[in-house]
Amino acid sequence: MAMQDVFLFSDTIEGNIAYARPDCPFEKVKKAAIAADANHFIQAMPEGYDTIVGERGVGLSGGQKQRISLARALLKDPSILILDDTTSAVDMETETYIQTQLKNLEGNHTIFIIAYRISSLKDADQILVLDHGRIAERGTHEELLKNNGYYARVFEHQYHTPAKEGR
């Protein structure tokens, strides 16, 4: 699981990524960081993967913390991966890169993405729109836009374009 609000330990970046798999080889840690689009900023740190971060990730941006958390989740290689607004603090280019990496994961994975940004959801096989804890809409991005329901209104608000044009 990777969450929007990330908890990092007072440890090295490598130690934070490998928390659930401390005996994991460095190359696998780095591969997970690359998939989470974290490798470039980690290597730019004073000690790279050996840089110590303070508890709760003091000194890192929100997006950097989220990418370390995502790398940690990817390193575990779970069959079910839950991403709770994991890319809320990253730019669109980074989010697109991460989504591509998630699509190309080796093996069979089920990924649940909890998000408010349509860009995080639009390529999902199924999208569930919740309203007061109940499923209000269900379908693909295209189907939900055609329904002209809440999802379509959120799309129009986020993209500043009518849902029928944004497909």
Please place each PLM-identified region on the residue numbering.
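A short, proline-enriched helix->beta-strand linker immediately N-terminal to the Walker B motif
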Residues: 75-79, 108
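ABC ATPase nucleotide-binding domain helical subdomain, centered on the C-loop/LSGGQ "ABC signature"
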Residues: 14-55, 99, 108
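Conserved D-loop/post-Walker B switch-helix segment of ABC ATPase nucleotide-binding domains
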Residues: 91-101
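C-terminal portion of ABC ATPase nucleotide-binding domains
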Residues: 35, 44-48, 100, 122-167
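ABC-fold ATPase nucleotide-binding domain signature/coupling loops
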Residues: 2, 9, 39-68, 86, ...
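Catalytic Walker B motif of ABC-type/P-loop ATPase nucleotide-binding domains
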Residues: 81-84
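Conserved catalytic loops of ABC-family nucleotide-binding domains
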Residues: 104-115, 121
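Short alpha-helix in the ABC ATPase nucleotide-binding domain helical subdomain
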Residues: 70-71, 115
